[in-house]
Amino acid sequence: MDELRLKVAVQKSGRLADPSVDLLVRCGLKLSRGKDQLVGYGENLPLDVLFVRDDDIPDLVQQDVCDLGLVGLNVLEEKRLELSARGHPARFQCVRTLDFGRCRLALAIPQGSPWDGTRSLRGRRIATSYPFLLAHYLRERDIDAEIVTLSGAVEIAPRLGRADLICDLVATGSTLQANHLREVETVLESHAVLIRTPLDLPAAKHEWVQRLLLRVDGVQQVRESKYIMLHAPRSALPEIRRLLPGSESPTIIPLEGCADRVAVHAVCRENVFWETLESLKRVGASALLVLPVEKMLA
């Protein structure tokens, strides 16, 4: 691989795989990748994408094999605690919080089991794929419990007699329900993050990292943004500006032949609901139009 091209590690399969690639594509990347290939080539940007296991991503960035990585905060913090326990500092840097991959690492007990807060954990066996995060959680609360480390199928551990309860990732909770478990405590709120190597990169690479970060910011702002256009009486402008959700100063344009009315254009960085439009109309707005924003650079 060309050392002057950025190397970005993403999950090859799983809940973060498609959103990670989609983010890069929305940042302008045209990715060439054959079926089952583990490396994708950026045709229009000096960037290659490595498709790997999610728990390998922090290591690849830590060891400077990859310049950037998109990974879940749960995986990143588990690796950080593991490195610390082994006397090694975590060298990767978290540079962006991403707006996908939201879930939580949670404790769950069999349905019907009593729960009296975290004191119920004392002396219990807890199955998990995140032993370092769980150990950190227990240590902070001075709780002595046995951690049973499993690489998968954690949710069936209580039914197999391997554990009394579990600590696992929860998104919708449907898997817990299917296995007759109920969530009782949150250990960590998680989401996708973008990490980078701490190395001083060559100037060309550094420039592309900065450009990519700027594009990521733009993509995430666009997802939350709408462009609103409307007509309104000049006298209603203070109230209209108050009602526009999350907008900066709007653009005010005089209307031809209507001295007392103007056109208002604004980018709103929050959701625009029907109730918002109805409130705007009540204070005198008309010809309201809400458009999606395709690209934005702050």
Short names for language-model regions:
Residues 1-47, 71-92, 97-99, 104, ...:
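Small-molecule-sensing regulatory modules
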Residues 46-68:
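Short, structured active-site "lid" loops
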Residues 59, 104-108:
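Signature of uroporphyrinogen-III synthase
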